[in-house]
């Protein structure tokens, strides 16, 4: 049985697109799958696009400190390290929630003098392929040594 695909309106309006209609349909299907994935994982495209407001380093006025959050659903264990802890890989363990978000809280009382703008850091991730040092996905600035 042959799959019937509804013709995209743009192809109906522009006959010059008919030779590439199959490729356009594949791209459109891939787009729809990705949008469905985003809807399931983030709730909406807006929430997905605003991830930078939740992930990475975020100041918490109520708790008076910084949160570091990273989405790593397949990770078994995650640590954060950097110049603020003398690059000790396994000193600060992050905690995983049910959605696969790993987080660590840095109270200002303890880290005010060590954690500052321009601090260098990485995450140490234990996955199926072993331990790796990574640059966090939501890092806003990276430097190469």
Predicted regions and their residues:
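The feature marks proteins involved in alpha-glucan
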Residues: 1-63, 67, 87-91, 96-145
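Short proline/glycine-enriched turn/loop motifs at strand-loop junctions of beta-rich domains
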Residues: 71-78
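Conserved aromatic beta-strand anchor motif in extracellular beta-sandwich/beta-rich domains
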Residues: 80-82
């Amino acid at each position: 049985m042959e799959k019937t695909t509804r013709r995209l309106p743009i192809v109906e309006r522009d006959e010059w697109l008919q030779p590439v209609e199959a490729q356009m349909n594949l791209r459109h299907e891939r787009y729809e799958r990705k949008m469905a994935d985003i809807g399931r994982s983030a709730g909406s495209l807006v929430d997905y696009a605003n991830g930078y407001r939740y992930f990475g380093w975020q100041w918490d006025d109520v708790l008076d400190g910084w949160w570091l959050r990273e989405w790593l659903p397949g990770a078994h264990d995650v640590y954060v390290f950097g110049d603020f802890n003398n690059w000790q890989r396994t000193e600060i363990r992050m905690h995983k929630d049910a959605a696969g978000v790993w987080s660590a809280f840095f109270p200002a009382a303890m880290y005010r003098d060590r954690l500052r703008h321009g601090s260098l850091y990485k995450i140490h991730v234990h996955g199926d392929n072993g331990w790796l040092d990574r640059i966090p996905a939501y890092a806003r600035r990276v430097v190469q040594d």
